[in-house]
């Protein structure tokens, strides 16, 4: 037969062996502890048709021989013991070796020993750690508890690797049958971070105080399920898991209506001044010379300082109407309308003490007895009760407040949200509320709290 055919056949046969090896590797891709193999090729002997010649004396140079190879053969298959990937199996007896090494297993109490990378073990009825094929895993065992008094504490807790290896066995009598837990002792560090991955809604709170004494004691249903409980605002988190982190005197402003005040403006050519929310406003205007009326001049002067007072002025039927929507972040200087000094000139009709208070500041405190009269709160119940009381006060100042019959109810619903309901109390007068919540901030405080925080 032609040599080329022999070489081709040998190549096909050798690559068939290599393909068989790779097929076996693929077939065992999910075999625990399997290490892949590779085929090593070697060329077969060559047939020499012409031998090499040396240079001739007559001047002819030397020539190489003419050799023809006779094909290829598989010399060996080699195991490649590279580190494989590990994965969690949730089986307590499954083990894996990272790096070099083997598990030692034996079918006959150690007379013969085999080695494997397969760590898929389990316990048999006698407590032996065995492979799926029944081979017992061997290694070093810690000293028996009965020997504890004979050796030092350090030696008892040390595994002596100089001793002969033995079967790994755990006495089945050491195992306890499953039973319900009666007491649990826990020692752990609480998460001191400002973010948690899992959050739950705060407990719901009705629109009436839960107890006539303190409004704090929790309420349970007939099945002993906790239904209402006041919670400390300083330990709460937002829906996204970020800590609110309230500290002393941090809090919010809640406006229930737009503050308004209407008054006449006196015509004058001299200087006019007024103090609103402790900000002095003044102007001088001669209507005959400027062509601007005193009421328009007063409007312009007040609007020029709106960023400091929160108050905006309008002219209605020749009268000056002041308005504060209470929607600016800040302290009392930009909330409500308060005349803090007598007006002069065009503002002569504005008297110190005149005010329209429709926004209230609520401040967090760590005190166990918050002063509700100054807007202090500590728990969700404290804040709920404050908002409900003030909302009813703004809606109808003449009505005696009783939380059980309040026409504005405030509660925390089952979703942990503050729910405010303006109920119809039968009064023909339209009593709408325009609620706006803004953050409290002050240049004199480092504990400012913005609406984005909560």
Swiss-Prot record:
UniProt keywords, alphabetically: Bacterial flagellum
InterPro entries cross-referenced by the UniProt entry: Flag_bb_rod_N, Flagellar_FlgE/F/G, Flagellin_hook_IN_motif, FlgE/F/G-like, FlgE_epsilon, LlgE_F_G-like_D1
Cited function: A flexible structure which links the flagellar filament to the drive apparatus in the basal body. Absence of the gene leads to absence of the hook protein, lack of the flagellar filament and thus loss of mobility. Approximately wild-type levels of the flagellar subunits are still produced and accumulate mostly in the cytosol.
Domain of life: Bacteria
Annotated protein name in UniProt: Flagellar hook protein FlgE
Organism: Helicobacter mustelae
GO biological process: bacterial-type flagellum organization; bacterial-type flagellum-dependent swarming motility
Family named by the database record: Belongs to the flagella basal body rod proteins family.
Protein's cellular compartments: Bacterial flagellum basal body
GO cellular component: bacterial-type flagellum basal body
Major localization listed first in the record, in broad terms: other
